[in-house]
């Protein structure tokens, strides 16, 4: 930097400062990536994937050996501008990426996702900038309704230079929330605003055709969001159908309860009659519906978002996880694990503080149904005990933070972090 400051030509000085900034940014990114290199975890993943049909262990074992060698050699030289150390660090990260992305579970080589263009704010924003509500006690109605640059995309060539194809983009600046792939894998359900800025459930084919609302309703003040497909063609969605609001904010945040809707005959029936919010209905492997419900009255409501399950018609509604406990405060984005009758993954978060993102936990209610008793594993912290922590802002200062996990099986997940 001192040498640059002594440059007499201003244009040369500016160019060299820009080059220095790029170099510092490269080293910062390398340092951040190396913190999560975790060679021991890569070894365990390799040993597990070797057992899967289709994994080319002979191809990737030399990469694993090279990764081990490079880690043993060390990367401290990157801070002195040692070009060999920088090259070694990049090589180690490339080996890790290749080994893990060779997982046969990714052989389909396509992912459908929501993409948000956020420019230079990408390293600073949290989930409200990605279309979620700005707190942990409200539904989608409290989320931003315009000013987004969002689209549904299909990602492919996952193991190489990733390709991206636009499936759909709103024309009104709406966010895109609550993506649910149809059972047939040819179309996707999602939430966006209508022209009058009310939320509704929509569907589009993955080839970009067939865009349409899934819920058609003439009521001028009803909204629908956070939907899920039922196997029989009907859908469950969250709606402001109860016309009530959250008490502690004087009703300013609308409460959403679940409705059952049939697109064929446009019939609708309310399923839940809760004082406060429901979130994230999803079909379990046994055909029941799992969701999160916020209990409020006569208890410490900072700590009472409970995972529930019910039949698709709303009967036999029961607590599944968290009733009677103060940890965790919230469990969002629950998804059943493939091949399991009881286990699921979810994101635990707080009440105030960081909204909707948090720690990623695998639960199994057959092992316990409250607090840490049924928490099988926190990802990515292998061998770290999960400790009960009764705290309002539960995940403030926690890193990494996750949202929207999608299990590929009971060991591997796609998740936004």
Question: What residue spans do the PLM features occupy?
Answer:
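Long amphipathic alpha-helical scaffold segments
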Residues: 5-33, 47-166
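Residue-level detector of Asp-centered blade-edge/turn motifs that repeat once per structural unit
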Residues: 106-107, 183-184, 230-232, 284-286, ...
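Hydrophobic beta-strand positions that form the internal "hydrophobic ladder"
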Residues: 111, 188, 235-236, 289, ...
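Short, conserved, GDST-rich strand-edge loop motifs in beta-rich repeat architectures
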Residues: 116-147, 193-194, 198, 237-254, ...
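Beta-propeller blade signature
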Residues: 150-156, 202-207, 252-265, 304-315, ...
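Multi-bladed beta-propeller domains
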Residues: 160-174, 205-223, 261-276, 311-330, ...
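Signature of short aromatic-glycine-proline-rich micro-motifs recurring in repeat-based ectodomains
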Residues: 176-180, 224-227, 325, 330-351, ...
């Amino acid at each position: 930097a001192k040498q640059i400051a002594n440059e007499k030509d201003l244009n040369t000085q500016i160019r060299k400062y820009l080059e220095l900034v790029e170099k510092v940014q490269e080293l910062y990114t390398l340092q951040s990536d190396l913190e999560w290199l975790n060679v021991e975890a890569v070894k365990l993943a390799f040993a597990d994937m070797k057992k899967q049909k289709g994994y080319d262990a002979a191809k990737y074992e030399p990469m694993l050996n090279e990764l081990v060698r490079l880690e043993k050699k060390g990367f401290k030289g990157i801070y002195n501008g040692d070009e060999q150390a920088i090259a070694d660090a990049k090589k180690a990260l490339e080996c890790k990426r290749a080994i893990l992305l060779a997982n046969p579970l990714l052989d389909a080589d396509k992912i459908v996702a929501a993409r948000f263009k956020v420019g230079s704010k990408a390293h600073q924003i949290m989930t409200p900038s990605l279309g979620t509500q700005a707190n942990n006690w409200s539904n989608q109605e409290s989320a931003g309704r315009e000013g987004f640059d969002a689209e549904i995309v299909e990602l492919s060539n996952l193991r190489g230079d990733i390709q991206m194809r636009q499936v759909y983009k709103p024309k009104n600046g709406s966010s895109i929330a609550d993506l649910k792939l149809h059972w047939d894998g040819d179309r996707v359900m999602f939430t966006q605003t209508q022209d009058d800025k009310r939320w509704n459930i929509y569907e589009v084919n993955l080839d970009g055709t067939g865009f349409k609302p899934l819920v058609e309703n003439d009521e001028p003040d009803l909204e629908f969001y956070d939907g899920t497909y039922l196997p029989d063609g009907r859908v469950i969605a969250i709606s402001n159908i109860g016309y009530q609001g959250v008490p502690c904010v004087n009703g300013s945040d609308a409460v959403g309860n679940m409705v059952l809707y049939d697109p064929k005959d446009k019939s609708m029936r309310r399923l839940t009659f809760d004082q406060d919010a429901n979130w994230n209905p999803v079909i379990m492997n046994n055909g029941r519906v799992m969701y999160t419900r916020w209990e409020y009255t006569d208890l410490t409501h900072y700590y009472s978002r409970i995972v529930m399950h019910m039949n698709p018609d709303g009967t036999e509604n029961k607590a599944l996880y968290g009733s009677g406990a103060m940890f965790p405060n919230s469990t969002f984005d629950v998804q059943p694990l493939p091949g399991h009758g009881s286990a699921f993954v979810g994101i635990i978060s707080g009440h105030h503080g960081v909204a909707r993102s948090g720690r990623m936990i695998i639960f199994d209610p057959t092992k316990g149904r409250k607090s840490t008793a049924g928490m099988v594993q926190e990802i990515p912290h292998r061998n770290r005990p999960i400790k009960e922590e009764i705290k309002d802002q539960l995940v403030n200062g926690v890193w990494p933070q996750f949202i929207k996990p999608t299990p590929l099986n009971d060991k591997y997940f796609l998740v936004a972090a």
